[in-house]
Design a protein with these regions (language model features):
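Core catalytic region of metal-dependent phosphoesterases/phosphodiesterases
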Residues: 1-57
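Conserved beta-sheet core of the metallophosphoesterase superfamily
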Residues: 25, 42-137
Length: 138
């Protein structure tokens, strides 16, 4: 989410983009300069460029943004809460400040590998249970 590429080696970027499957919904980050964004629009597999997006998957709602954003609290029903997916922090932690509704999808937090949305939901469900259990012990 955001900072699609650092640097300006457009030949390398072309090489990587040619290998990607599917359609790309690009959320802009602080290193995605106006010239890069203009260049991204020339790619057929990038179908959308936005500052933020909302998506639904398996009846769960996600807010995609480059930056961590608080979208819910533990008082909400976890099945109805909006989960923020972000990348900006370059942290190795999956959750921002240990909050289950703020999930870091940056490669830094996942051994420099992409992760599936089902893995995110699994991690989220486990974190919510952990937080609720912790709050119940107080």
């Amino acid at each position: 989410l955001g900072d699609f590429f650092l640097g300006t080696d457009y030949d390398y970027i072309n090489e990587v983009l040619d290998k990607l499957n599917g359609r790309i919904h690009l959320v802009v980050g602080n290193h995605d300069t106006p010239s890069k964004i203009t260049w991204y629009t020339s790619w057929n597999n990038i179908i959308e460029i936005a500052d933020a997006l909302r998506i639904k998957y398996k009846k769960r709602e996600f807010f995609l943004c480059h930056y961590p954003v608080l979208t819910a609290s533990l008082e909400q029903d976890p099945n109805r809460a909006v989960i923020n997916l972000f990348g900006h922090t370059h942290s190795k932690e999956k959750f921002y400040e240990d909050r289950p509704y703020m999930y870091n999808v940056a490669a830094d937090a996942h051994d420099n590998r992409p992760i599936s949305i089902d893995t995110i939901l699994n991690d989220f469900d486990e974190k919510v249970k952990e937080c609720i259990s912790f709050l119940g012990e107080e």
